[in-house]
Amino acid sequence: MIPNRDTIEQKQLGWVELITGCMFAGKTEEFIKRLRRHAFAKRNVIAFKPVIDTRYAVNEVASHAGTLLPSIPVNSTAELKEKLEAKILEKKVDVVGIDEIQFFDEAIVDYIEELADRGIIVIVTGLDKDFRSQPFKNVDRILPLAEMVDKLTAICQKCGNFANRTQRIIDGKPADWNSPLILVDGNDSYEARCRNCYQIEKG
């Protein structure tokens, strides 16, 4: 049976947008811009971030350029879901933003899909690769599911070419392969690097 046109038009369409790339590529800046655009269009917008990310602000998503957007810090997908569903009971939510999805547990991917299926626009950011240049958790799974994917590049902080890798620096030297996967810090711990300037010490 083919649904009639009126039924199709009445159903609010949801989708997933992924903004990805290396560090310092402007992912969060683009994320904030998109959410602000939706808010300007009178849509109800809510943003979340992982508690672990406290580089510039606790209750705001912050870009490296200093742009801020109010957000709700959460420890897990379960906490995000609890807070978001409570907001949805209060009023309609049109757009949900989730920053740094690589820091969430793996349940976040299924919940993002559920929200889109319910007619909500979900905009997420995440690093495509970790400091070892291996696919990052959650981003690798959301990549084939998202309707829109933007992969941003940065400027190599060593040679000035375009960069698509995240270089971890410890005590002024490239990090060892075996150093911890998650280490949230600022400019002192990471650099954007191109293919030629990226280094990893395999100890």
UniProtKB/Swiss-Prot annotation:
GO CC, one annotated term: cytosol
Pfam families for this protein: TK
Enzyme Commission no: 2.7.1.21
UniProtKB keywords: ATP-binding, Cytoplasm, DNA synthesis, Kinase, Metal-binding, Nucleotide-binding, Transferase, Zinc
Catalytic activity: thymidine + ATP = dTMP + ADP + H(+)
Residues the record lists as binding Zn(2+): C156, C159, C194, C197
Catalytic residues in the record: E100 (proton acceptor)
Subcellular location per the Swiss-Prot or TrEMBL entry: Cytoplasm
Disulfide bonds: none
GO biological process, one term: DNA biosynthetic process
The UniProt record lists the keyword Metal-binding: yes
Binding site for ATP: G21, C22, M23, F24, A25, G26, K27, T28, D99, E100, I101, Q102
GO MF annotations in UniProt: ATP binding; thymidine kinase activity; zinc ion binding
Enzyme class: transferase
HAMAP family: Thymidine_kinase
Quaternary structure note: Homotetramer.
PANTHER family: THYMIDINE KINASE, THYMIDINE KINASE, CYTOSOLIC
Similarity comment: family membership: Belongs to the thymidine kinase family.
The name this protein goes by in its record: Thymidine kinase
Native species: Mesoplasma florum (strain ATCC 33453 / NBRC 100688 / NCTC 11704 / L1)
